[in-house]
Amino acid sequence: MALEEVVRYLGPHNEIPLTLTRDSETGHFLLKHFLPILQQYHDTGNINETNPDSFPTDEERNKLLAHYGIAVNTDDRGELWIELEKCLQLLNMLNLFGLFQDAFEFEEPETDQDEEDPSHSKLPENKTKSENSKDNISSKRINNLQDMSLDSDAHRELGSPLKKLKIDTSVIDAESDSTPNTARGKPNDDINKGPSGDNENNGTDDNDRTAGPIITFTHDLTSDFLSSPLKIMKALPSPVVNDNEQKMKLEAFLQRLLFPEIQEMPTSLNNDSSNRNSEGGSSNQQQQHVSFDSLLQEVNDAFPNTQLNLNIPVDEHGNTPLHWLTSIANLELVKHLVKHGSNRLYGDNMGESCLVKAVKSVNNYDSGTFEALLDYLYPCLILEDSMNRTILHHIIITSGMTGCSAAAKYYLDILMGWIVKKQNRPIQSGTNEKESKPNDKNGERKDSILENLDLKWIIANMLNAQDSNGDTCLNIAARLGNISIVDALLDYGADPFIANKSGLRPVDFGAGTSKLQNTNGGDENSKMVSKGDYDGQKNGKAKKIRSQLLKNPPETTSLINDVQNLLNSISKDYENETVQYNEKLEKLHKELNEQREELANSREQLANVKQLKDEYSLMQEQLTNLKAGIEEEEESFREESKKLGIIADESSGIDWDSSEYDADEPFKVEFLSDFLEDKLQKNYEGDISKLLEAESKEQIMEQIRNQLPAEKIQSMLPPTVLLKARINAYKRNDKHLTNVLDTISTKQSELENKFRRVLSLCLKIDENKVDNMLDGLLQAISSEDPQDIDTDEMQDFLKKHAS
């Protein structure tokens, strides 16, 4: 950043330094050095006694900026900078232009001879008279902010992009073109008036500057709104449009309208614009108006079979284009939309009208467009949302938002001032064309809303209106603690004794107690109603409340006692509820423990069932295996029977019951076995070898035949097939046993050879000598205790026998 600094000295002895610092890149001048001189000039009108080190506070600085219409830019370090034009205006106002003219090569500014107020802006020579007039009007609008006693802290916190207090001059031109002679006055024109509406400046009527007609549009006003008596009504529900063609057409129109720099404008439109610029006789507003109509025609050409519906919601909250444009303070487009049929009575999903959107943001406060906005959106004043909240409710709620206190006070004062001033303004009937024409000989239109919407109706129907919670606007303001708005509402006649559904009243929060005690009944500053329509001193209800409070001021002792009783009651209720909840908690804990026990039992039963299921599955598997084994054994038995010569037909009648037939029983015939057993015991002492040596088989068989008849022997013998099976089985078993014996003998021989080999290796002798030495070795080992064996003697023994 390249800075240029020039120091000059003021005062009769040149003892007051004044430094001008300019940023050569942007051309802006540092504001800090102007502030001490401006403060001294504002307080005394003389700068010769300025203390250059005495800087005003933030609040005083903001008042100076508002009073002199200074727009500032803030850099990254927080320093405030002003533009070249404003620097020249301030230097000329302070008669310091000549000191710095040569240093910065300033051009001599042209002074407006008709301007008497030093706070009004003065422009350089290169400004035209038209531009000078516009800036003067803008400066007046900005200067009015200081007169309203705005909250400077809240004003500094406003988050609007218009915070620099720059006024769009095209809006002012649009006002003068569409509504002749409607130059807007100060936002607080009515604040400076007495209760009867008279101006305090020696009877001068400030309404002369705002005497332009109010142009009415009735395309959206039904008979309910135009009929008498006037009453508060619900906003129309947000429309539901399912036609995608209409949505696409509206979207295309809004894109071309709001973002013209990214749209390709038709050649004809550009040519028309160039022709108008070349003529030099049309204003910025006229160019915008033609652009609006041209864009409208362009969209109609693009969608010839689809009607342009300006009331389609553009977001999920049900906001129409009119809602959005009022919230961003685009007055020019609001006027065009109303002229072309946009419905002002539609609410969003919460029933909030477009005027509510205007007061819920600070944009209309920053740009000073709220008063002009009321000329087009006045039907919204009698609307309430889904929670029965009027426009006054929403203004008060806005005052509780961070940085919006000053804006809310501005909206309230402008609204009440517009209500009073509109009674003296003519009314014209507007159409959806470019011009509006009066509908009677006096150029006025009899509109029931404008006829009946006076301050008396506002006080009677809206000031003390309650929302769905029973809150009046005064109740909300008292709870928020906004003293300036509370005092204003009380001056208008708001009732501080109306309780909401919770039983709370504004007076419970101190609303009106201190103010009314210090207010005289004849104080002219407390009167807020015009003389022609309503006298605030004759308001019976407000007068009764005021006199009641003055005669019987509230006792703080009783209030403290009531609060103490309320706290005690709340504490007792809390203790009772705590006991109840503790009992419920204990009961729940008990039930929880029971449920836990039941759950544990259920889990145990489930584990047992799972175990039984596993055992059952195991037994099922074992049973299946047994059945399979039995089947295999039966198959094997059948194969073995075939090998033994047992035919299935022959063995079908045999009883194979294990109780009568033992598969392991020796192959014997019972009577033969008994005969041989008896013979062995009697004759051979049980030695069968002696029997076989003494007698042959034929002799034994002959003896049996002699003892028993052949029929009995035949009956006692098993079936032939069984005998054959036994014989074959015996032979097979004998063969099997012989094979087993041979196998064992072979294994034994191999084992003996291994042991013989081991001994030969241990004794270091030949294998063929091991057998001869085994007896002596065994005797030597077994005759001694293993612990007492003399290994040397054993070695001698082995050597002796080895030789």
Swiss-Prot record:
This is Regulatory protein SWI6. Residues 108-150, 169-212, 266-288, 512-540 are annotated as: Disordered. The modification Phosphoserine is found at S149, S160, S176, S547. PROSITE patterns: ANK_REP_REGION, ANK_REPEAT. The lineage of its organism: Eukaryota, Fungi, Dikarya, Ascomycota, Saccharomycotina. SUPFAM superfamilies: Ankyrin repeat. GO terms for cellular component: cytoplasm; MBF transcription complex; nucleus; SBF transcription complex. Component of the transcription complex MCB-binding factor (MBF) composed of SWI6 and MBP1. Component of the transcription complex SCB-binding factor (SBF) composed of SWI6 and SWI4. Interacts with MSA1 and STB1. It comes from Saccharomyces cerevisiae (strain ATCC 204508 / S288c) (Baker's yeast). Keywords: Activator, ANK repeat, Cytoplasm, DNA-binding, Nucleus, Phosphoprotein, Repeat, Transcription, Transcription regulation. The keyword Glycoprotein does not apply. Residues 270-288 have a biased composition (Low complexity).
